[in-house]
């Protein structure tokens, strides 16, 4: 029964393909069961889905072939076996057609995807070319110009600060010198006050001495007046006595002459009194002259001390005013320096923020450029993979078309033999293509691009 089924299948397939008539086989063989044909179909489909090389169609292989029962008798073929083969062939063709439609649909989807990716690739290539052809960005120039301006301002601020510090040091030195002069003037003032106090003691002593001398002069004058009074009383007494004696002389001529004695005594007393008065006046005049000279000297010293003290006071006042002015100038300069430091620190902070923002923008641009390059590289890899898949499908389709358009006359030359899985695997060739693409970039710009392709047949 199996022999009749195989014979009818082959005859039906032959008649369906070439019309009536019986084919002539150089070798008559029959298939044992339907399982052999189905196994051959599944094996062929496996080869189409796995291999990139076209399967050999010169022989019709089966993994399992039943024992061939040959009937050699007057070139007679069992048409029932041909009908069974025809049905199997139709089923196989239907399955292959469905698979081809599925492959065509997948191939069409891949083609659409490839077109879309090629369009995206062209867009990215145009974008990259536009970015490459565009004038170099001025961000770096603006950044350098801004940095130069900031450095110039920092140098200017540094110079101003150094100048202000030099002026401050000079003012501090002047202030120290003025303080030293003030200390010296204060010391001179204290010395003058000490001298003035000493002179005041001398003046007080001189005043006391003058008062004492005045008192002594008064006492001497009183004594002189008292002596004059006593002398006058004595003179009056002597005159009275002289008159009485003169009367007695007139009365008594024999008595000695007392007039000459009285004159001598009067002359002596007058000489003594005149001498005492002259000596007292001379002593008084000398003392008064000495006291006047001492008082004059003391007055001159006091007047000179007062004048020097007034000069020192004026100098102290002028120095105090100058110190106050210098303190005000120093305070204003310190305030200006603090204001300048705060201003320049704020400006420096703003410039640092601007620099950080520009650096962040540059990093973002570099990251974006690197991301575009990675996307471009990924798209290139996808495109190469799709190109390889398209080439594989193209080869599969070409192999399938060559298998379909094979002349049916070779069907008579088919030799049905058992093929082991090891032999089938040896006829399946897989081609592996490895492409290594090297892109060198620097700061987001493509410097060089190189690609290497290696093919290996597995």
From Swiss-Prot:
Q: Where is this region: Head?
A: 2-96
Q: Where is this region: Disordered?
A: 1-40
Region annotated Coil 1B sits at 140-240
Task: Give me the ranges of the annotated region Coil 2A.
Answer: 257-275
Task: Report whether Glycoprotein shows up as a keyword of the record.
Answer: no
Pfam families xrefs: Filament, Filament_head
What GO MF terms are annotated? structural constituent of cytoskeleton
Span list, region Linker 1: 130-139
Q: What is this protein called?
A: Desmin
The uppermost taxa in this organism's lineage are: Eukaryota, Metazoa, Chordata, Craniata, Vertebrata
Q: Which gene encodes it?
A: des
